[in-house]
Amino acid sequence: MTTTLYRGGRIFTADPDQPWAEALVESAGALTFVGADAAANEHSRGVADLRIVELDGAVVLPGFVDAHTHLVHLGASLGHLDLLGARDAADLQDRLRAYAAQHPDAPRLIGGQWLFEPLAGRAPDRHLLDEAVADRPVYLHSNDMHSIWVNTAALAELGIDDATPDPVGGTIGRDAAGAATGMLYETAALGLAEDFLASLVTDADRDRALDAAVAAYLEAGVTGAVDMGMRGDDLAALERAAADGRLGIRVAAHWLIAPTGDPAADLAQVGEARAHAERLADGPIRIAGVKIMVDGVIDSCTAAMRAPFADGSRPGPIWPLDALEPVVRAADAAGLQVAMHAIGDEASDIALTALERAIAANG
């Protein structure tokens, strides 16, 4: 077994009694010594298989932790169309055309990271995307991951038409005549579109995406991550990676609780999270809590506000208090952390009230 001595560096320890050190010794995947060079040399004296790395004054930091990620989605997105730098609608269309030309055999085109600001007040709609690509479905995740912008072919593939009802907690964008515009908000995006796209992904696809995310993290010095929206297929991919020795990082996850409109079904999801938490109590993966999307975001005017937005819209919360309270109470009673997304003032009040009542009930 090789023991490695790293010496001659500036090592940040995060220990208030010894914030900096010169050397560290690693053996069997664990640090056996952190301190001064001279003491490290003495600690390593007589070690049969010793490898020495001269740091030459380099700074060494503990591994970083990404406190909010979606691992499998992150890995998959590395191969998708990135629209973050699009300057305006025309530039976005040009990038989409170029991506389509680069992927002539792809049955559908997936991208993301687009922002509302470059559209200069123009509402995103299917026609703008159709002008660039009309022969294949196009799915573009917004930068905040709360909306998906699709073209006409994607609406048809999803089976969404003017008569399709809004899902619980979401909205299908419609024009003044009631026609679907190609914008899917909140659970219409995360449910209708994401669930469809997820159904097309194989276990091998998920494994490759996870491997890509882990490789990108390790290259950047990230050794731990908190996945804020874990689902069953993604958890299975994580467990496969851990079993095969491919995971490479430690993961704490929050199980996504999706609104169903059925109190029993909502609570059943908490039970599922608890079962996974108990099953994965030890090891590199654990279910730390639940994730609940109480409302949307400001950019797409889906945050639950007490006053209307400038366009006159005033959407309600994804989770009203009477539905949210029993879920939060049950998760807290099960020993699960409760992570809630709440941006609007109405949603924030709902989230805080649910927490207060859970504390009152559970102590």
Model-derived features: where do they sit?
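Divalent metal-binding segments
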Residues: 3-7, 12, 16-268, 288, ...
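Residue-level detector of alpha-helical secondary structure
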Residues: 30, 354-357
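Secondary-structure transition/capping motifs at alpha-helix termini
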Residues: 243-249, 276-283, 333-334, 356-363
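Substrate-binding cleft/loops of secretory-pathway carbohydrate-active enzymes
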Residues: 267-277
